[in-house]
């Protein structure tokens, strides 16, 4: 009898000791998990608040998220600014240290050294083939040229707006545009696009579907072409597949981390006349100086006012963002 009682008491004590050990082990494990989670959270928080140096991120699709406007206190300490300029500017300035000089001037406006990037492009036509806008704020300087006015207008329409695009297989399908916001965007070293509108019996309207020469030409030897046709009508499409791509795109709205500075010209290009531009506002400005030093001085002087009409974005942008839907 006493042996049974002793055994019961012993088992009870062992159970208490074992339970106490288990509870302590669980507590240690939970402490480890909690402290490790806090460490990871602090590290990630520090990284997200750190300076973004404009890495070439492979972002596809239109996934931008609007951040607080630049009037927020301390915005320049956690933001990057990209300034895109033509080769003509650096050639005219002819000074190996001109970028360093401008960086020091931007510093007086609150932009830390290393937060402003200067990116050169050869000409508007080539830049339009592969526009890469990786900074939080992007200013594109375009020298006005009467002969390139339409190219400038199309490039501005492209980079000042968000586009959601899908590839097009013209060998298998006919395509139609569903509304004013629906366009076909072609890019490449040389794009010639022809279309043949079809009736309900898929017969050509004013053209022969079997004769490409009878198609209507809507773009010829262009590097960027935003094609607009009559809505609700199927079209058979032909384009130079070896040097060009074409995508079926829908304009989603303004891309507010991009602004265009037009250099010269009597009037600033107006893309708001396009009914797809909604609201009817644009981030296009004009400076009228003959010398590029004057242009850059003006931009430095007014950089903070320019930024205030823009919004910071969370994603980088490259030409793939115009092409593939996520």
From Swiss-Prot:
Molecular functions per Gene Ontology: metal ion binding
Signal peptide start-end: 1-50
Spans annotated as CNP motif: 165-167
Keyword Disulfide bond: yes
Record keyword Signal present: yes
Post-translational modification: N-glycosylated.
Family to which the UniProt record says this protein belongs: Belongs to the rotavirus VP7 family.
Subunit structure: Homotrimer; disulfide-linked. 2 Ca(2+) ions bound at each subunit interface in the trimer hold the trimer together. Interacts with the intermediate capsid protein VP6. Interacts with the outer capsid protein VP5*.
Stated name of the protein: Outer capsid glycoprotein VP7
Organism, scientific name: Rotavirus A (isolate RVA/Human/Australia/A91a/1991/G1P[X])
Lineage, uppermost ranks: Viruses, Riboviria, Orthornavirae, Duplornaviricota, Resentoviricetes
